[in-house]
Amino acid sequence: MKVLNNVLSEDLIQEISKELKNKIQSDSWGTSEVFWEPSLRLNSTGTVLISNCSDRIQKLLLSELENVLPEYSEVFVKYHLWQKGSAISCHQDMNYKFGATLYLNDVWDLNWGGIFVWKPNDSNTMKAIAPTHNTLVVNDESELHFVTPISYNTDTFRVTIQIFAPI
C-alpha cells in the first residue's frame, strides 16, 4: 500500500469541489447496494452514493496523478459519498491491477469513523490511516483492506474519488 500526501494541485481540488457541489444536487448517483457485491457490504448499515467523474475532471486528475499511479490500459474514476453507517468489508481488489482512494474532505474527525485499515502482505500487523485531505492511497499489491463504519454523529459525507484499473 502506498500513501501519498498532497498529490493534486489546489486548482484541481477547487475544480473537483465545484463539480461535486453541482453533482450532489443531481440525480446521477447510484448506491453501493446496487454496485457492490454483498460480501463488501457486511457490517454496513448505510450506503455509499457513487457517481462518475466528468470526462474533463477525469482527464485532469489522471494527468496530475500520472507519475504516482501504476500503468494501466483502462481505468474507472468515480466519486463516492460515504453516508452515516456506511463501511466496506475486508477485501483485496483481486480483479484490479490497482485500486486507489483520494480523500477530499477538508476536515475529518477520527470519531467519525471511516478509517482505512489494511494488512500488508508481508506482515500480520494491521495499519490504518484517517481520511486526510488530498491524500492518495494506492493498493497495487492486492492487500487486504476495509473501511470502518461512518459514525451516525457526523453531519457530513466522507468524500472520496475511487480509481480502479481492471486486470
Residue positions per predicted region:
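Non-heme Fe(II)/2-oxoglutarate
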Residues: M1-L69
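Catalytic core of non-heme Fe(II) oxygenases with the double-stranded beta-helix
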Residues: L62-I167
